[in-house]
Each structure stands twice: as structure tokens, then as C-alpha cells.
Amino acid sequence: MPRRREVPKREILPDPKFGNVELSKFMNVIMEGGKKAVAERIIYGALDLISQKQPEKDALEVFVTAINNVKPMVEVKSRRVGGANYQVPVEVRPVRRLALSMRWIKEAARKRGEKSMAQRLANELMEATEGRGGAMKRRDEVHRMAEANKAFSHFRF
């Protein structure tokens, strides 16, 4: 690793429609091949679908709740001790927590069966808000792994 100064974190501008930084980050996660306009259309389309299906709830609120529900608290990291690999549970840093939740929601939405990506994303976000869906399943799986390997938590990093 270079021993030079630490590279400063780039400031991400809030998205143009809602003025939300998390939504802007999610747009960058959804984006493929530099096609930001396509990612923007998918996300805003999904939020429109959410507001149509659940008019009593704010679409942005549903998005934020879904992201917060999917955030993992602990994960496991492999640590080699005396010729054996142990899965050591560690707490997830806040920045990684957000990144993982966004990535898992994107992956779960991609695996769904609906026609358009906007529909898949809308349904995945609504399910994550209710504590269901592929992304929540992934988070629970990670938490279960950490719980199962709690005995190795004294092998700190």
C-alpha cells in the first residue's frame, strides 16, 4: 500500500428530483457502462410505481426505509489462525453498511421475474420495507453466519 497521504472522499451531489444523497449513490450503483440517464429513468420509474401502488406512503420514505432495513449489522471475515481458517464475526462500518444494502437490493431486483427493471426495483424496495424479499434474505443469511460463528469473535482483526 502506498504510504502517501489519504485520498479525500469525493462529495456526491444530491439527486436533481428529490435532493437526496443516498438516492444519488443508489443511482451510481444501478448505473452500468456510464449510462446514468438510464439508471435515473429506472430509479425514478420505480419510485413512481411505488407512489402509485402505495399512495398513502411517500416513495422516498419507502426507499430510505428499505435501505435501512437491509443494512447488515455484522458480517464474517476469514481469519487464518494456526493452519485453520475461522469465520470471525465483525461489525460492519457505516459506509460499507450502506454500500452492501444498495448492492444487495440491486442484485435481488435483477433476479426477480417482472418485465422491466423499474418494476423489479419497485417491488424489491416495497418488500424490503416490509422485511421480506431477496435482499432481506441475504442480510438474514449474513447475520445467521455471524451468529453461528460467535464463538470465534475473540479472534479480532
UniProtKB/Swiss-Prot annotation:
Any keyword Cell membrane?
no
Q: Which UniProt keywords apply?
A: Ribonucleoprotein, Ribosomal protein, RNA-binding, rRNA-binding, tRNA-binding
GO CC annotations, alphabetized: small ribosomal subunit
**UniProt xrefs under InterPro entries:** Ribosomal_uS7 (IPR000235), Ribosomal_uS7_bac/org-type (IPR005717), Ribosomal_uS7_CS (IPR020606), Ribosomal_uS7_dom (IPR023798), Ribosomal_uS7_dom_sf (IPR036823)
GO terms assigned for molecular function: rRNA binding; structural constituent of ribosome; tRNA binding
Q: Whom does it interact with, and what assembly results?
A: Part of the 30S ribosomal subunit. Contacts proteins S9 and S11.
User: What is stated as this protein's family in its record?
Assistant: Belongs to the universal ribosomal protein uS7 family.
Protein name in the entry: Small ribosomal subunit protein uS7
